[in-house]
């Protein structure tokens, strides 16, 4: 569930429910340089740069890297490219590549917001994460070798906090009634210095338009 920069229309108001999402562990065959090619093998649900998303009543299980994640577009942009402009590569068949100049699209928000994950069943038969990607290695060193059910990248926009430490409602993220889960907040914006499994700050609810 994602938005990319420089689209003519940006998506929001998404409901994903009654799905069985499982065993997505095949090698990533995306075209090199494309945004899809950066997704690690063993990823279940990814919610990227999209607002007003409800993920509920799903079974999400048996992924070797992560069952679900809520991330900014920024997590896919290599740090060396954020300041250094790189000549765009033309990919076949209109395939989208990672755009380090995404901020030039003033209508695009690279950050997820108003995401509510609730009433899902998370399971995993794997006891050890895949080590062919950086996230799997991160879980070994930071998460006791456990594969997260829900991960939040912790990359926030400048207006994430308003009136001191109050979170801007536009970027609210809530979790509820998903059973016993392994949750991680990465703090990826600060080299994982405040990496935590503490879920308390995200145990909340978000009201959505019932007509959607």
Language model features with spans:
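A generic structural motif
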Residues: 50, 63-65
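Acidic, glycine- and Ser/Thr-rich low-complexity intrinsically disordered tracts
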Residues: 76-212
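Boundary/linker segments of alpha-helical solenoid repeat arrays
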Residues: 27-29, 66-70, 125-133
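Right-handed parallel beta-helix/beta-solenoid
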Residues: 1-54, 70-79, 107-111
């Amino acid at each position: 569930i994602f938005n990319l920069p420089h689209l003519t229309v940006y998506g929001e108001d998404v409901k994903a429910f009654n799905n069985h999402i499982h065993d997505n562990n095949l090698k990533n065959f995306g075209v090199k340089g494309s945004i899809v090619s950066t997704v690690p093998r063993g990823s279940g649900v990814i919610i990227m740069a999209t607002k007003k998303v409800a993920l509920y009543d799903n079974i999400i299980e048996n992924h070797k890297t992560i069952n679900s994640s809520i991330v900014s577009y920024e997590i896919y942009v290599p740090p060396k490219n954020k300041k250094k402009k790189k000549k765009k590569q033309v990919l076949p068949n209109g395939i989208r590549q990672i755009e380090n100049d995404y901020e030039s699209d003033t209508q695009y928000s690279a950050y997820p917001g108003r995401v509510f994950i609730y009433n899902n069943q998370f399971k995993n038969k794997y006891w050890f994460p895949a080590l062919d990607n950086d996230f799997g290695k991160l879980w070994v060193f930071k998460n006791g070798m456990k594969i997260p059910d829900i991960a939040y990248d912790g990359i926030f926009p400048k207006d994430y906090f308003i009136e001191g430490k109050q979170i801007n409602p536009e970027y609210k993220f809530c979790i509820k009634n998903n059973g016993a889960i392994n949750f991680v907040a990465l703090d990826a914006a600060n080299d994982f210095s405040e990496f935590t499994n503490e879920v308390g700050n995200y145990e909340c609810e978000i009201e959505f338009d019932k007509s959607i």
